């Protein structure tokens, strides 16, 4: 059962104090940090001004990336002197690394004031208050989810694009991954709560939403009533329901799992106009032997079959992936099989990682670890292959018209080139010349159309000028320096029939109660 979130509420504990949240890791952590920011503002804190030292620094940590612990403790060491100069300064550590190293964070960095985990973000204000009162570090790590993060308010990072979690946790047992042990088994939100959160974002001008889950297409696997069997069509139904939300122009999701990626989801993608023609489908390895050792419950033939069906129904879909190089026991033959699959798959881009052992995962104890110099060589060969493919695939778009959602941050050379940056519907970044048929200043969140003139491996260039410019509510928000805030949305675990969200749901759902 979920605990009462009101027990952690400490009104005005941060009154007059500034805060900064520093995020390491994945999109889940980025979205969790939005919740932490909303929670802290509710407790009276305010975001620190640029160039000033915050009174509170919160680290939302990652345990997946290589050297995550070194990065955290190195940064904590740098803050030690700042805290000595300002005794009222507080430091909190949360997230996956805190969940994993619950017994060692304070031992390694005794100047930390509060430690919390992935399951109890809502406890942070209470921990900070107790730490200040008791003059000691307060550590509270729980082993099961206290409540969905969605019951916390959120201060969004973007005026035009928002994250919405559909679930927490993961039921897979990949031998290289520590996430399930840190975030627990999968638990799914009610469709009505998800739709209410999407609607609340759209009402404030957000035009693009990304649905988040560790295994997003397994949505619907775990209901509050154990007698209710899983609805294997739940995610496709959710996509179609989001398609009916007026004002939601772009819908994305990440990350799916190939083993559970079904025909109905592909059909929903193809038949729902606001679902973007983009798919991130993690491969991890092209070797069936390595996939078996990873406990990835699919093989390369199935993976390529999914891509073939997606492209048959969504001809211009952009497909990206994740690949691990140098998994224990990977031979040169295994690696060649990965290269062969990459050649056949024609990914738009690939996030490639050199395998490194993660303590607490089965693969960390495998005897046949691949030498680092071999891993590096294979990694460079894979990068070279994917860069060639990316360039070839991007070159096919030269001369085509693209619709871009203008981004707040762009290319490193934009100041020099006077270009701006937008993201196309298929997820590609495009640096464009902002001259042409424009309606006043082009702001982040506005929508423009232009023609691609040049292709690079990691982005496109459009120097043909703007053909159309549509000013948006998100652009107005960006120009005013504002971002959306979303109120708590209930924690329901059931899966009733999907319907339209209640108009006031996101404004009135303040408790841990359920309801669609």
From Swiss-Prot:
Location within or outside the cell: Cytoplasm
Principal cellular location given in the protein's record: cytoplasm
Record's compositionally biased regions (Basic and acidic residues): 412-438
Binding site for [4Fe-4S] cluster 2: 170, 174, 177
Keyword match Lipid biosynthesis: no
Disordered as annotated region, ranges: 409-438, 492-516
EC annotation from Swiss-Prot or TrEMBL: 2.8.4.3
Ligand binding ([4Fe-4S] cluster 1): 26, 62, 96
Cofactor: [4Fe-4S] cluster
Radical SAM core domain sequence ranges: 156-392
Record text on cofactor binding: Binds 2 [4Fe-4S] clusters. One cluster is coordinated with 3 cysteines and an exchangeable S-adenosyl-L-methionine.
GO MF entry, a single one: metal ion binding
Matches recorded under SMART domains: Elp3
Catalysed conversion reaction: N(6)-dimethylallyladenosine(37) in tRNA + (sulfur carrier)-SH + AH2 + 2 S-adenosyl-L-methionine = 2-methylsulfanyl-N(6)-dimethylallyladenosine(37) in tRNA + (sulfur carrier)-H + 5'-deoxyadenosine + L-methionine + A + S-adenosyl-L-homocysteine + 2 H(+)
Cellular component per GO, a single term: cytosol
Pfam short name (any one): Radical_SAM
Keywords per UniProt: 4Fe-4S, Cytoplasm, Iron, Iron-sulfur, Metal-binding, S-adenosyl-L-methionine, Transferase, tRNA processing
Keyword Membrane: no
Record domain TRAM: where: 395-466
Assembly notes: Monomer.
Family statement: Belongs to the methylthiotransferase family. MiaB subfamily.
Protein name in the entry: tRNA-2-methylthio-N(6)-dimethylallyladenosine synthase
Lineage: Bacteria, Bacillati, Actinomycetota, Actinomycetes, Mycobacteriales
Gene: miaB
């Amino acid at each position: 059962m979920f605990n009462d979130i009101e027990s952690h509420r400490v009104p005005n504990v941060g009154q007059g104090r500034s805060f900064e949240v520093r995020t390491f890791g994945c999109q889940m952590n980025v979205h969790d940090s939005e919740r932490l920011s909303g929670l802290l503002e509710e407790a009276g804190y305010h975001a620190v001004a640029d160039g000033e030292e915050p009174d509170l620094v919160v680290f939302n940590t990652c345990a997946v990336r290589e050297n995550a612990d070194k990065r955290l403790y190195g940064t904590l060491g740098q803050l030690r002197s700042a805290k000595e100069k300002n005794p009222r300064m507080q430091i909190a550590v949360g997230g996956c690394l805190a969940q994993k190293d619950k017994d060692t964070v304070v031992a390694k960095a005794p100047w930390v004031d509060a430690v919390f985990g992935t399951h109890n973000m809502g406890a942070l204000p209470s921990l900070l208050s107790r730490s200040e009162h008791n003059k000691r570090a307060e550590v509270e790590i729980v082993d099961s989810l206290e409540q969905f993060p969605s019951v916390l308010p959120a201060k969004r990072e973007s005026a035009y694009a928002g994250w919405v979690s559909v679930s927490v946790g993961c039921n897979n047992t990949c031998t290289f991954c520590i996430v399930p042990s840190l975030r627990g088994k999968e638990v799914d939100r009610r469709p009505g709560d998800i739709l209410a959160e999407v609607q609340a974002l759209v009402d404030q001008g957000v035009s693009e939403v990304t649905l988040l889950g560790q295994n997003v297409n397994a949505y619907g696997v775990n209901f509050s009533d154990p007698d209710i069997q899983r609805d294997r069509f739940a995610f496709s139904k959710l996509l179609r329901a989001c398609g009916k939300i007026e004002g939601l122009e772009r819908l994305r999701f990440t990350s799916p799992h190939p083993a559970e990626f079904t025909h109905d989801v592909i059909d929903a993608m193809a038949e729902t106009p606001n679902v973007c023609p983009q798919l991130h489908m993690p491969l991890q390895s092209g070797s069936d032997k390595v996939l078996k050792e990873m406990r990835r419950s699919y093989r390369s033939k199935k993976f390529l079959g999914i891509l073939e069906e997606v492209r048959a129904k969504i001809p211009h879909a952009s497909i990206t992936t994740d690949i691990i190089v140098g998994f224990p026991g990977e031979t040169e033959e295994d690696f060649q099989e990965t290269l062969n699959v990459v050649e056949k798959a024609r990914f738009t881009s690939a996030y490639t990682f050199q395998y490194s052992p993660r303590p607490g995962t089965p693969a960390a104890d495998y005897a046949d670890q691949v030498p680092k110099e071999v891993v590096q060589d294979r990694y460079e060969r894979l990068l070279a292959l994917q860069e060639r493919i990316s360039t070839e695939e991007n070159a096919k778009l030269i001369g085509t018209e693209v619709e871009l959602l203008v981004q707040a941050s762009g290319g490193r050379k934009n100041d020099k080139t006077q270009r701006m940056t937008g993201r196309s519907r298929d997820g590609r970044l495009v640096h464009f010349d902002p001259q042409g048929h424009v309606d006043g200043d082009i702001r982040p969140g506005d929508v423009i159309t232009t023609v691609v003139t040049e292709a690079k491996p990691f982005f496109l260039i459009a120097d043909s000028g703007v053909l159309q410019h549509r000013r948006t509510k998100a652009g107005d928000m960006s120009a005013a320096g504002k971002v959306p805030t979303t109120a708590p949305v209930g924690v329901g675990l059931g899966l009733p029939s999907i319907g339209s969200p209640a108009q006031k749901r996101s404004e009135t759902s303040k408790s841990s109660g359920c309801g669609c």
